[in-house]
Amino acid sequence: MAAVDEFDEVVGRYHLALDEFSRGNPDPVKEFYSTRDDVAIANPFFPLTSGRERVVERLERSVRNFSDGEVGFQMVVKWVSSGDLACLVELEEWRTKVGGREDVTPFTLRVTTLFRAEGGGWKVVHRHADPITTARPAESVIPE
């Protein structure tokens, strides 16, 4: 199977794992992350962190914020380079209970995910997710 076709199949499974994450189950997503120590994650709940142990801990803590959810995806960019690196840039459209709330809340994340061919498959080596999906004034980066 060509690297691009194989990656398409992995993206489909990764999206299903993120759907599980929105329901409070971190295990399928954790399986996608690299076991190497150069793995990194940045999400809306915590600062950037790296290292397999710390990334898994952040996933386990982050998932506690979600239940009863689902995620839709808008692919913006997808590429595979030299057969060993791949990138997704997409909008994730979440509908989930957040932070113990009783109502399902919709929100969108802007996400960049880097994958590396590793151990006979594709593993996430970096994921950055944030809620910035519209233009903001320059002053918005200045802390109050």
Language-model region placement:
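Short, conserved active-site loops that position catalytic residues or coordinate cofactors/metal ions
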Residues: T35-D37
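A beta-strand edge to alpha-helix "cap/lid" segment located at domain peripheries
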Residues: M1-P28, A40-E144
